[in-house]
Amino acid sequence: TQQADLTSRMGVKLRDLLLQALAKTPVFQAAAQPKQMSRLLVSRTEAGGGYGLHVDNAFMPVRDGQMRTDLSFTLFLSAPETYDGGELVIEHSGQTISAKPGAGDLILYPSTSLHQVQTVTAGTRLVCVGWIESQIPRADDREALFDLTNLKAELAKDHDPQSPIMLTLSKTLANLKRRFN
C-alpha cells in the first residue's frame, strides 16, 4: 500500500478538493457532525496488497495536539470493476459487513470497529481515508440527531420553513446539539 504525498503542490490541491467535497455533502455532515478531522490519506493498493484486521487508534495527531477518533471513513476513488478483491470488511455490533462500492461512494463507520481491507488480487484500489472527532461524542446521540435531520428534510418538502412544526423541529435539533455536545 502506498500513500500519496498530500503536502506537495498537487497533493494540497487534491486534499483541498476532497475536504471541500466532504464539507458540501449534507448526509456526511449530518451523520458525522464533524468537530475536526485528521489529515487525509490517499492510499493506493495494488495486487498482493491489503490491510489486516485492526482497530484505529483512539487518538490521532492534529495541528494543536490530539483529537479523539469517533468515526473513520473510506472514500472510494476507483471504480470497483478496475480491481479484484480489496473489499472493506467491518465487524460491528456482531455483524460482518463487506463492501466494495463505486467511485465517489463513502463508507462512514465507528472507529471502534475492527476492520480490514481484503487482499487486492488484480488491478489497483485507490481510496481516501480519514478520521473524525464528532461534535457529538456518543454514537446513539449522533444517530438520533441524524434521524431528526432526515425527518426535517422530509417535512421541509411539504411545510414552510417558518411554519410552527418546522420552527419547533429546528429549535429541538439545535437544543439537542447543545445538550449532546
Indicate residue ranges for each PLM-predicted region.
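Non-heme Fe(II)/2-oxoglutarate
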Residues: 1-41, 144-181
